[in-house]
């Protein structure tokens, strides 16, 4: 969506995705500056209505990234930008917003407990806002440098928080980049992610390239089977911006149609395995 948005504008992006055959989208505050109070409630409600009128649901949103900085002052400013993004996402009609763990300090064996406690406090501070806005917070696995880099770390944080406002965003590409088998990770996380979301993108294991499935090393059939086996009921959400970024703008419509067809193939495999459970 990022490259398309920069070319078309936000409403035209909804039009393009609807025409290509997508039924849902991620409203990504990672990149778009929609985490301020520049626009009011009416702006976001009308934007959400515009998307749904074209058959595109805002199935999730992204909070701005990173979630923290080395500067305590900058981290506090970012915290309330995340809160603003949560409020805006609720007006759009998004049921959940992905909030990344704090990565202002790289994870090491020596600082793991300190970083765990920092993130625990960070997410706990968001609970009253999630309750106020009626939106869930999806905690994402971020590879290599974060407190959610492995399924075990992610589950520990989620279980310790132990609050219904939280769910899990499982990122397939990040998992592969971490060197963990995504299907095994899905089974390890289990029912914690059943009503969460799944970020779908591929890589070759050496770079977090965020490309389209089947253009990397992820075993997608095993991933779909694992999702079916745990009773997954969430969305499959592309984070494959690198694929569309490599195309000239004139090919965006064709590229989006192809991406939608690949997505429908994955859904078909998921539905097949779901019937076998």
Outline where the language-model segments fall.
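Hydrophobic faces of well-ordered beta-strands that scaffold small-molecule active sites
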Residues: 1, 25-27, 58-63, 97-99, ...
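Active-site beta-loop-alpha junctions enriched in small/polar residues
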Residues: 1-5, 28-30, 63-66, 102-104, ...
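Short, mixed-charge, low-aromatic patches
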Residues: 1-8, 39-41, 79-82, 108-116, ...
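Catalytic-core regions built around general acid/base machinery
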Residues: 41-54, 122-129, 185, 222-226
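A short acidic, helix-capping loop that chelates divalent metal ions and anchors anionic groups
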Residues: 31-35, 67-72, 105-110, 177-178, ...
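Histidine-acidic metal/acid-base catalytic patches
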Residues: 7-21, 78, 148-170, 174-277
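N-terminal pre-domain/capping segments
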Residues: 1-94, 114, 163, 195, ...
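Active-site acidic/histidine proton-transfer and metal-coordination neighborhood
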Residues: 8-12, 50-53, 70-168, 250
């Amino acid at each position: 969506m990022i490259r398309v948005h920069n070319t078309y504008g936000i409403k035209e992006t909804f039009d393009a995705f609807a025409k290509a055959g997508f039924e849902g989208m991620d409203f990504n505050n990672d990149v778009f500056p929609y985490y301020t109070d520049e626009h009011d409630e009416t702006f976001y409600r009308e934007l959400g209505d515009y998307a749904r009128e074209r058959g595109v649901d805002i199935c999730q949103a992204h909070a701005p990234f990173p979630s923290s900085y080395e500067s305590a002052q900058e981290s506090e400013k970012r915290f309330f930008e995340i809160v603003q993004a949560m409020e805006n996402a609720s007006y759009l009609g998004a049921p959940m917003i992905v909030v990344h763990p704090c990565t202002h300090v790289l994870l090491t064996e020596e600082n793991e407990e300190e970083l765990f406690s920092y993130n625990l406090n960070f997410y706990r501070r968001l609970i009253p806002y999630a309750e106020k806005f009626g939106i869930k917070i999806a905690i994402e696995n971020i590879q290599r440098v974060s407190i959610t880099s492995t399924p075990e770390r992610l589950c520990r944080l989620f279980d310790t928080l132990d609050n219904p406002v939280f769910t899990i965003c499982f990122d397939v590409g990040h998992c592969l980049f971490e060197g963990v088998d995504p299907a095994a990770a899905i089974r390890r996380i289990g029912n914690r992610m059943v009503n969460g979301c799944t970020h779908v993108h591929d890589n070759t294991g050496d770079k977090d390239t965020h490309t389209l499935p089947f253009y990397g090393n992820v075993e997608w059939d095993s991933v779909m089977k694992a999702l079916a086996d745990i009773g997954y009921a969430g969305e499959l959400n592309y984070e494959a911006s690198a694929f569309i970024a490599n195309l000239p703008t004139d090919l965006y419509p064709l590229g989006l149609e192809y991406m939608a067809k690949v997505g429908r193939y994955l859904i078909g495999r998921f539905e097949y395995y779901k019937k076998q459970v």
